[in-house]
């Protein structure tokens, strides 16, 4: 089991990070809430990880905090929730926001997540109600501990148009192209990078609390 990786961040994009550790490059699937906290490429990063093995694939999932990683492990035990949907859930809501939804039995916020219908939302509320007790002591109002460099990225780098990149990221998460374009248009401002656009769009689409 690979429980944690610390190394140099070589590449990052919404949904994935490439981390070099001891000469090996690890492709790690990450939720957007973790992507937002990654440092600039070339800096050191620590990710709490979950290694999944299937007949047709081996996947490594990375998270900004132990709480996010441990919640992911509980989510994939819910009937009908696989790793992809669990990552999608943690892309729209961070662990603490999700826990608050469960405690408040807030199905309305959950059904706004792509891939989560009414039945899945109700199943999540029922099955996770008892399981979140396993996270006791981890649910604290603190910042994720992922960056060990100078901090999260704040400026866009040369590359694709930020709006197009942000729309593509929302579509990859499961939103329809029209929904993604509308959400980005609502929050777009001058000199915004794709990370900021995605974060603000998700905040509007999935209000927490």
UniProtKB/Swiss-Prot annotation:
GO terms for biological process: DNA recombination; DNA repair. Residues 65-143 are annotated as: Domain II. It is found in: Cytoplasm. Homotetramer. Forms an RuvA(8)-RuvB(12)-Holliday junction (HJ) complex. HJ DNA is sandwiched between 2 RuvA tetramers; dsDNA enters through RuvA and exits via RuvB. An RuvB hexamer assembles on each DNA strand where it exits the tetramer. Each RuvB hexamer is contacted by two RuvA subunits (via domain III) on 2 adjacent RuvB subunits; this complex drives branch migration. In the full resolvosome a probable DNA-RuvA(4)-RuvB(12)-RuvC(2) complex forms which resolves the HJ. This is Holliday junction branch migration complex subunit RuvA. The gene is ruvA. It comes from the Bacteria. Pfam families: HHH_5, RuvA_C, RuvA_N. GO terms for cellular component: cytoplasm; Holliday junction helicase complex; Holliday junction resolvase complex. It comes from Marinobacter nauticus (strain ATCC 700491 / DSM 11845 / VT8) (Marinobacter aquaeolei).
């Amino acid at each position: 089991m690979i429980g944690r990786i610390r190394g140099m961040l070589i590449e990052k994009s919404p949904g994935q990070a490439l981390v070099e550790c001891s000469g090996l490059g690890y492709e790690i699937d990450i939720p957007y809430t973790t992507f937002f906290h990654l440092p600039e490429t070339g800096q050191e990063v620590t990710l709490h990880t979950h290694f999944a093995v299937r007949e047709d694939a081996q996947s490594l999932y990375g998270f900004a905090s132990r709480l996010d990683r441990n919640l992911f492990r509980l989510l994939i035990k819910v009937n009908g929730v696989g790793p992809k949907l669990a990552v999608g859930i943690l892309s729209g809501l961070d662990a603490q926001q999700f826990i608050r939804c469960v405690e408040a039995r807030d199905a309305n916020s959950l059904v706004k997540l792509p891939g989560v219908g009414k039945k899945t939302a109700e199943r999540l509320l029922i099955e996770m109600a008892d399981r979140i007790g396993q996270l006791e002591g981890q649910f604290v109002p603190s910042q994720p501990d992922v960056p060990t460099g100078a901090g999260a990225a704040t400026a866009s780098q040369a590359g694709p148009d930020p709006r197009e990149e942000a729309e593509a990221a929302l579509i990859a998460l499961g939103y329809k192209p029209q929904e993604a374009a509308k959400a980005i248009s609502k929050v777009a401002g001058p000199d915004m990078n794709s990370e900021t656009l995605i974060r603000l769009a998700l905040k509007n689409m999935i209000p927490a609390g």
